């Protein structure tokens, strides 16, 4: 029989030698189990067709073409290389997906722990954030691990029952996560548009929202388990493909309820929030304090001040030439009084209420210190016997202030108790070094706040020059804690500088600092507007980028049966959607400083977090 086979093979193919069945090899596998060994020569006895299908020959012809040699091809190296790269791919995929699952679990656990442990985070608004973290935690614990096994094994090997459980949990948790984003957007929209919403946002209302979210997700996820499946569902599982029901009606229902309708609602709500926030920022910027003193007004005021200084020089020369003022009967010293009035109008609103503040006694310094907030006039104060009186001053409106500035036009240089004239800026500089400044700053605050918050009205500054030569003790000393006295010559010299340079210099520089302040406010408001836009863009952008590709693919696969999507692309889109559960803890907490501080306390302990905060301060 062996001879017959040999003859038949030799007759069938001229290229095959007659001794083909005698191969100098130790052994050869035939039909997976048959070995025949004879005197070191292997003799192969098989069916001819089976033999030829399993043995690969490599033909080699010598240079003369007189003989042909056949060698068996060894694919071991190629097979080993392919298996090695498959192993590397599996390990890399397992590491990446495992890290993604771990980060998702840690992030959502941190959010839940922060809300539970930190009392200041236990408010009604954060209940939605906590429920969102629970949904994302379920995605990380129930859905992503089985999905990772599916990807690494390159097929579903866990049976149809587990496939039903996995797909149902997938739809339930992902739908709940997305619908929580809608609930948070609606909550923020109501907070912005309804002033009384903080009173209406009760725990019962928020828990009702959370219940509706989970109930809707449950309906969408359990529909296939009650018969809404396509006919090829079991066939796909047998082919190791575990997918949600591909019934066209169910896919349209599920994708619309899970993604497309929530997407439109989120985009609409955040767009309205952005528009409202932008309008409020612009309105606040318009109400902010903005001095509109023009350059022409400043120039005319400076010219008038120069004329006034020249008049004072002439008056001083007359005094030095021997002109004297009669002495009062009580012997307290001569008084030279001279009044000149100038008006400067600085408009920062529409209301025309005005008030007069006239420099006065020590006991009323706290009341008059409100004028310190208005730094565009140089207030000269005498040491003693000065009277403060206020009239028509409205603390609530702070609409306008008519400041009467007292300055000296002449001085009796021969008076031993000459007055020391100091400017407002010098008072503030000295007063900050003493304890008494705290009480005066309390008086400053209301006016400064009203100006900063954009109070309306016209500020009319009236500057009568009034000088009274009198005895010892200064209001500046009271402001600075009751210390300090000056000599007559030094006071006279200071008067000329402060009355001329102080008032004129401050007045000439009114426009520039407040223009810079207005520009700085505009930049700040623009920065706040950009930050609000960036926050909303990050929230909506992350949601759209993560889930839009998957739901477009899901709807396309159900509507277009002929369309084929590569397995790698389908897996990428699916895990990109899962990645949204990794981002949610970051997006919805990183912009909240309370959450950031809570995370630091959880990571480093309360003492370390407190030390870090004090170091920053």
Curated annotation (Swiss-Prot):
List where in the cell it is found.
Cell membrane
Out of the domains of life, which is the source? Eukaryota
> What are the TM regions of this chain, as residue ranges?
96-116, 129-149, 165-185, 206-226, 257-277, 535-555, 571-591
Per the record's keyword annotation, is Transmembrane included, yes or no? yes
Tell whether Cell membrane is among the UniProt keywords.
Answer: yes
**GO BP, one annotated term:** chemical synaptic transmission
Where is the segment annotated Disordered? 309-336
- Keywords for this protein: Cell membrane, Disulfide bond, G-protein coupled receptor, Glycoprotein, Membrane, Receptor, Transducer, Transmembrane, Transmembrane helix
Q: What is this protein called?
A: 5-hydroxytryptamine receptor 2B
- Which organism is this protein's natural source? Drosophila melanogaster
Q: Which gene encodes it?
A: 5-HT1B
